[in-house]
Amino acid sequence: SIIREAQRLIRHPDFRGVISDLGGPTANMYAMGCGRNAASPCKVGQCLFPGVCASLETGHKAQIELLRAIRSLPGVKKAFVASGVRHDLVMADAKYGECYLEELVKHHISGQMKIAPEHTSVRVLDLMGKPGNECLIAFKDLFYRLTRKHGKKQFLTYYLMAAHPGCTLDDMQELKRFATSELRTNPEQVQIFTPLPSTRSAAMYHAGKDPCGKHHIFVEKDRLHRQRQKDVLTARAAIGKPRRPKP
């Protein structure tokens, strides 16, 4: 139980009232699951790509209740969700998604929240199995509308990736332009892709083929060229302040 774990943390002699991150790898998938019969095999195989599966129960109500329960515990001054929020799931939940994000803005963000679009090239996003830019922009606009509504000085930061299988230098230049013009940011949280065992991306890296194995894809393996992809993105550019949509 997360509540019991929080209670144990509160009893620790070094606890000072702040839970630094309730997020984890996928903060807002708490209590989500497949609405299909468990005995019935799934023919889709992916819950979140190319879109959120209609059978996935994406409601954020249970997590809203969890957050409220944790911050009501005696001894808890603040409980932050610093990372791990899947922005596509927030936007897919028409009933509770905005309420969940508003709950975060009001009570659970210390100043900035990190989300992980990873890229903006449609071709690279398809290989990653990640949602498109429309979802990202919609989430960004909603986030800043809510921060404006509640008078909060909060910001989004973006986790991005260089040299993923299929990603070229041109793709990184496209990502740089998007980050500068649409996200109004000079990216700093940039990782060079590392092929981890038993992952789909690692299979693409070693095989040089798309996930279905039907088409060859470009894979940058030269160390200096992989670093160059990152350097394109982290180079400083003159930008204005983040644009906040009108309420």
List PLM regions with ranges:
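Short, surface-exposed, charge-dense and proline/glycine-enriched linear segments
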Residues: 45-54, 109-116, 143-150, 180-195, ...
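A broadly tuned "polar low-complexity/structure-edge" signature
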Residues: 25, 132, 167, 176, ...
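C-terminal accessory regions of radical SAM enzymes
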Residues: 170, 183-188, 193-247
